[in-house]
Amino acid sequence: MDQLFTRVARDRLTCLMLGAAEVAAALVRKRNGGVISPADFSAAMRDLRAEVLDAADFAKPPSDDVLINASVPLLEKHSINATDAVVLLAALRLAAQLRAAGRDLVLVACDRRLLRAAQAEGLLTFDPENQTQAELDALLSP
């Protein structure tokens, strides 16, 4: 994720608080599974809090009951979990706004099912665990 944070202006980054909580949960799973050390976990959580959760310059739209309810057809259509459906719908709505202004959205995620669903819905995607800096640069170039 460091490559994304160094490449993209802060005012162009958006993350649902629900999505940020999913990142925290993934870090806990990696720590509990021995994939990352307790020290690396602490550092990653500190960075997540500073760079996203507590950062005033990082857009964090809410996921309210209206958004959650509207996301149900996406979880049925793509066989994704509820959290992913909410994230996908929020991304689709933001992408529509950006595209109307001549810009686009890149959904960044590590979950393969979410990435497949996003691609099926016409979104650009980036998987920081499996794609390269060059691939990110190609997605972000004008």
Model-inferred region functions:
Residues 54-113:
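Active-site neighborhoods of divalent-metal-dependent phosphate/nucleic-acid chemistry enzymes
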Residues 26, 74, 120-121:
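Residue-level signal for well-ordered alpha-helical positions
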Residues 4, 90, 117:
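Hydrophobic/aromatic ligand-binding patch that stacks against planar heteroaromatic rings
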Residues 29-65:
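Helix-adjacent hinge/juxtasegments
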Residues 1-19, 27-44, 129-142:
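Short, well-structured N-terminal submotif of metal-dependent ribonuclease cores
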